[in-house]
């Protein structure tokens, strides 16, 4: 006998502190869920406020406005007829909790505070909230007076409880709790909970979705049950892009999966599931039954006199469970094309900007940034042509276009909002200038090509007049410090010109009511980690879409875009040697990034991963690389590379304190805002670690020709 229930979860593009906008998106998701016959609707974590409010959560106004929005939602008759699972902060006994509020027909059933808070990486939940440290305990919560008038209730249960309907049992866990070893869904499943909801504020990282889906599928495969995952999506005001992918799973299989990247502000995912499949699946495993009979945690049941199953007195062949489907994953190249593009669109439309300005150097990094803007233009154009009303409204506002205008191609949109500029000097090659121009023509940007030698000469002349000294390049006999100073003059003047052109180009083009353009940066994560950039040069911008992406991944993305977007010009960027073009070129010398850095981009990726993800200091990194790089490199060569990396990392650490806000994409990002917190005054020699490394090198060289047990080295 079937026991069919239709359930709904969603991706919502919420914005921190946009209370009314967030409310409207919640209402729209409820309306869609109800139209599809869902009896339970689950939304993202902290959906009323937006997840990324940060220290604004410490303001009691945020709790006040959350209750005001919540009251408007549940008193709306159109939200009645299904159970609502909505997230917001709640103050209970003068303690602030990250909560889920479950309601039905305008009545609050109970409030469930988050038990295990996310407090690593980009997450700092324990700065704002307190975890609920009373498993299985439920207390009375006194509703605010204004809410009492709406619901007719004075007290509601607050704590670790579950809902008992007439035909099933529903439990909830929140985001991080899925990732913990002792997840709440385990104890709940053993206590008979059949439907588990998870409301999340999970951000995008390259290749991270696999981990999230594996956890959900393994949870329902081991415990049985239905799992509804909801997530925020979009840029809600910070470096993070929440990547949606709402889904519904049952017994280790997926029956519905939402999109990971999209310009849709509201996406509702529904499925019809058969609870008899859950009961049969669980009852067939005897060891699971034994554990359930011995389970010590018994959850408080909140009884509701409602049956959630589809109301039908006899078999209906037109109603059937949703079919199982395979999980969908984007390739890393697709993730780079889509994630930063959606993030940039949210940023642009929400800051009331006119468009973007990009210093287009002819190198692969600025090329990658330009291609992400092109990808954004493709997404916006497709959405507008497919009738996405919010996108149409936003694109007309940004372009200052009439009520009947819709872009007819990505290039049409780019010509209105994307501005690029090649800022050449006598050190620039004809090849890079032509590549920049050809790429601009291919993507449709408004392009400026200028020479800035007179500006550079003016600054050098000013210095010469003031000091009586004139710096010259190294290849002409100058010192290293003169050489760097002359390079930095060019780099920093490009930043000044970028902001000048970003402010005035809309005026030059006669764009009405323009507030200027957003300046885009193009420093990749490896260069940021190594400090291979000039402080306050073109790496200093308003936002940087590639600042969390490695050079290796960017090259793969450009190769992908060349084929996907049919742009053969991109192959010229792939085949070019990465160079800053800040020094004069001769027939015997052309500046090269990797030669300047003393290490390859591939090596930088390894160093970055070991430093951040594996938590290695110089000594531990050296020992790990002895295993990875021997015998291709000698122990002494490995030690020199490790020492060189940490030396330049340390002396350039101060640069990371002022990095342009970048799209978070890589787990070894050196972003200093809150992801990778380190002092910025460090002894670059790491003397004690260096001595220990030298001791190991000497041991290895002494044992040359014989086997050395590296694991025995202390």
UniProtKB/Swiss-Prot annotation:
Q: Can you name this protein?
A: Glutamine-dependent NAD(+) synthetase
Report the residue ranges that make up the CN hydrolase domain in this protein: 5-275
Q: Which gene encodes it?
A: QNS1
| Pathway participation | Cofactor biosynthesis; NAD(+) biosynthesis; NAD(+) from deamido-NAD(+) (L-Gln route): step 1/1
SUPFAM superfamilies per the UniProt record, alphabetical: Adenine nucleotide alpha hydrolases-like, Carbon-nitrogen hydrolase
Q: Where is the active site?
A: 45 (proton acceptor), 114 (for glutaminase activity), 175 (nucleophile), 361
- For the region Ligase, give the residue spans: 329-714
Taxonomy-wise, where does this protein's organism fall, top ranks first?
Eukaryota, Fungi, Dikarya, Ascomycota, Saccharomycotina
> Which cysteines does the record link by disulfide bonds?
none
Q: Which residues form the signal peptide?
A: none
User: EC no.?
Assistant: 6.3.5.1
- Give the Gene Ontology MF terms in alphabetical order: ATP binding; glutaminase activity; NAD+ synthase (glutamine-hydrolyzing) activity
């Amino acid at each position: 006998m079937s026991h069919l229930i239709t359930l709904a979860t969603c991706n919502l593009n919420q914005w921190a502190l946009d209370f009314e906008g967030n409310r409207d998106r919640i209402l729209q998701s409820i309306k869609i869920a109800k139209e599809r016959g869902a009896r339970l609707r689950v939304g993202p974590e902290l959906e009323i406020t937006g997840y990324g409010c940060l220290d604004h959560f410490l303001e009691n106004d945020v709790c006040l406005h959350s209750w005001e929005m919540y009251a408007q939602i549940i008193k709306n008759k159109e939200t009645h007829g299904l159970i609502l699972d909505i997230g917001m902060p709640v103050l209970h006994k003068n303690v602030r909790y990250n909560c889920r509020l479950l309601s039905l027909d305008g009545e609050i059933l109970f409030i469930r505070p988050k038990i295990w808070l996310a407090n690593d990486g980009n997450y700092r939940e324990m700065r704002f909230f307190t975890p609920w440290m009373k498993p299985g305990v439920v207390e009375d919560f006194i509703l605010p007076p204004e809410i009492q008038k709406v619901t007719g209730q004075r007290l509601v249960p607050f704590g670790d409880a579950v809902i008992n309907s007439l035909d099933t049992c529903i439990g909830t866990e929140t985001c991080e709790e899925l990732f913990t070893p002792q997840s709440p869904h385990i104890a709940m499943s053993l206590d008979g909970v059949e439907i588990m909801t998870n409301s999340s504020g999970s951000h995008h990282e390259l290749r991270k979705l696999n981990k999230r889906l594996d956890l959900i599928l393994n949870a329902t495969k081991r415990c049985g049950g239905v799992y509804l995952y909801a997530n925020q999506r979009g840029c809600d005001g910070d470096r993070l892009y929440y990547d949606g992918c709402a889904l519904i799973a049952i017994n280790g299989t997926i029956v519905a999966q939402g999109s990971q990247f999209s310009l849709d502000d509201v996406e509702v995912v529904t499925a019809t599931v058969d609870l008899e499949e859950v009961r049969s699946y669980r009852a067939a495993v005897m060891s699971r039954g034994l554990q359930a009979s011995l389970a010590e945690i018994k959850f408080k049941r909140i009884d509701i006199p409602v049956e959630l199953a589809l109301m039908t007195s006899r078999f209906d062949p037109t109603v059937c469970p949703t079919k199982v489907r395979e999980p969908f994953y984007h390739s890393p190249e697709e993730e780079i094309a889509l994630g930063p593009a959606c993030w940039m669109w949210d940023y642009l439309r929400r800051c009331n900007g006119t468009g973007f300005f990009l210093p287009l150097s002819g190198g692969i990094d600025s090329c990658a940034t330009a291609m992400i803007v092109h990808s954004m233009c493709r997404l916006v154009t497709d959405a507008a042509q497919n009738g996405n009303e919010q996108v149409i409204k936003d694109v007309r506002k940004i372009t200052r276009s009439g009520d009947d205008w819709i872009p007819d191609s990505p290039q049409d949109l780019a010509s209105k909002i994307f501005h690029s500029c090649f800022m050449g000097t006598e050190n620039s090659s004809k090849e890079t200038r032509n590549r920049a121009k050809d790429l601009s023509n291919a993507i449709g940007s408004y392009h400026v090509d200028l020479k800035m030698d007179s500006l550079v000469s003016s600054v050098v002349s000013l210095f010469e007049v003031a000091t009586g000294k004139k710096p010259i390049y190294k290849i002409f006999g100058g010192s290293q410090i003169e050489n760097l100073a002359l390079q930095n003059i060019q780099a920093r003047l490009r930043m000044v010109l970028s902001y000048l052109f970003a402010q005035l180009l809309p005026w030059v083009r006669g764009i009405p009511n323009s507030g200027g353009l957003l300046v885009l940066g193009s420093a990749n994560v490896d260069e940021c980690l190594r400090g291979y950039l000039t402080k306050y040069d073109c790496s200093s911008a308003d936002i940087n879409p590639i600042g969390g992406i490695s050079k290796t991944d960017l090259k793969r993305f450009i190769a992908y875009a060349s084929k996907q977007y049919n742009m053969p010009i991109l192959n010229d960027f792939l085949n070019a040697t990465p160079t800053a073009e800040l020094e004069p070129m001769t027939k015997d010398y052309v500046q090269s990034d990797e030669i300047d850095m003393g290490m390859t981009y591939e090596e930088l990726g390894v160093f970055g991963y070991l430093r951040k993800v594996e938590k290695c200091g110089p000594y531990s990194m050296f020992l790990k690389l002895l295993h990875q790089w021997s015998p291709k490199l000698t122990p002494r060569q490995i030690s020199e590379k490790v020492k060189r990396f940490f030396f330049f990392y340390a002396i350039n650490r101060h640069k990371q304190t002022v990095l342009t806000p970048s799209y978070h994409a890589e787990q070894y990002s050196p972003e200093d805002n809150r992801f990778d917190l380190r002092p910025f005054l460090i002894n670059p020699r790491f003397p004690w670690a260096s001595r220990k490394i030298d001791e190991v090198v000497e041991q290895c060289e002494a044992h040359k020709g014989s086997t050395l047990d590296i694991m025995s080295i202390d």
